[in-house]
Amino acid sequence: MALLALSFRAYGLPLFERTGSIELAIPSSAIGASIGHSTSFSSFSFEPAFWVEFFGNASHPNELTFKLLAHIFERGGQPAIRPGGITMDSMIFDPSAGDPVRTISEEGGVYRTTVGPAYYESWSNFPDNIKFVSTLNFGNDSLDIARDMAVASVKYQQNRIAYFELGNEANNYPSERWDNSTEKYVQQWQNWTETIDEAVANDYSHGRWWASSATTDNTSLHVRPVDLIPAGIDSTGDVSVFSIHFYAFATCDPERAAKATIPNILNHTDLVTYADEEIYPSAKAALDAGKKWVIGEFNSIACSGAPNVSDTFAQALWVVDVQLINAVRNASAVYLHQGATLVFQSSQQVNSAGDDGSPGYSTYDLFYPRDGSKRGKARALPSYVSQLFLVEALSSSDTRVRALDTPEGLSQDHFSAYAFYVDSRLSKLALINMMPYYANSTSDYTASFDVSQHCGPHGKAWVKRMTAPYVDTGDTQMVTWAGQSFETGSVVGDIEIEEVARDGVVEVRGSEAVLVLFNKEDVYGL
């Protein structure tokens, strides 16, 4: 185990009890690190009711969306796409329909989304290696609806489908559906998936199902993976992946909205505690059963985010840390959710649609796909750069990840570090300083790390920096990854790849994250 010397300055808070040089332990081998992660680890979930807004259609794709995705693709990322969320449970297939169409209820919520062949045909706008989850409506309690969607997805896009998913967050369905009985839920789920398997050509769906897709809410119906596995949901061998959703904060009601602040979402200790207490029991149950597990949907703040929190640079730091928290816990993939305000989620929620009825895009989105009265012009948001950080960190297939212990003297609440291994050798290092740095802060909370022991044979290493003027910066033009910004989808600025100096010191300011790369061939853009 090698040691990374570190010094820090100006941590003028009681949480930092010592000054001077300290050391961060970095194991030189991958023993004890995570499973090997694929280049599809960082994936996406998009609310299907807003599919056309985000992606356009087969003949007219959304230019901004695909420009932003192209930067991920060209760095080697292969994110899977889950057209999922609450509106998948009111989605129907009509063979005579065109592009997806939303039906709005009198209350202003999305009552139904009708899709036709054009919906599936629009998947062809993605590169051939991008796979999809075929999401099926369980909420309307109609086997015909779910079966027809499965058959249509295979008819039009068989080669793109990686998995099938029946229902979204069933723990929040009306309680009378299964009388809060896990066993009744399992029975219906198995009956439906068996029938759908028989209906799909060549038994294509058997053994490709996601199971659970529950939230961590405290509900009377218990259908998290940790509940379903002992109830025998995989007794037929149909389950490939167990899914659970990760939302540690919410603006669905005033009480929870008050807690959805920048300091709270950037508390690393609390994020780890949530992962260990609410997520990992289900993850462990899946792994013990010999199955993969995924975060099938997640974002920082449920019910469409919190303005001035999730639409700031703080969200970028949150995304990087949470994805890596789950990577070290052996999630096979994480699906970052994107969408717009849904009235049905809560009558007390902070967010709303536009006054003219146009979508009120979620403030936790990576980008606003179209101009709108609620959110203004179409543009990338500050959190977009988090995806470039992550795809470059995990650019090599079979990368293993390890969380490093916080050294004595640094705050566990505000610092996290991760080592990346390829072929059992250290290849990269992520250093995330989540101490909130504002315009009126009395310190910039910079920490200095000595990486000289891990530099290559010629003593070299390179740094890419994810930064903004302040943690609450909301102007995407001021947010950069390796010196470049991406507000319009086009690259602005020259790439800045820092070569570590002879002394081996890398500095990380408060509210900043850096990726240290020890192999020249791994440095995109060099």
Model-identified regions with their sequence ranges:
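Noncatalytic carbohydrate-binding groove/subsite architecture in carbohydrate-active enzymes
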Residues: 148-150, 182-322, 329
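Carbohydrate-binding surface patches
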Residues: 408-456, 468, 511-514
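N-terminal catalytic cores of secreted or lumenal carbohydrate-active enzymes
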Residues: 16-211, 219-228
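Fungal secretory targeting signals
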Residues: 1-19, 81, 526
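Conserved beta-strand positions
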Residues: 46, 83, 134, 166, ...
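Aromatic/acidic polysaccharide-binding cleft in carbohydrate-active enzymes
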Residues: 302-416
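Conserved, mostly hydrophobic/aromatic
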Residues: 44, 81, 164, 169, ...
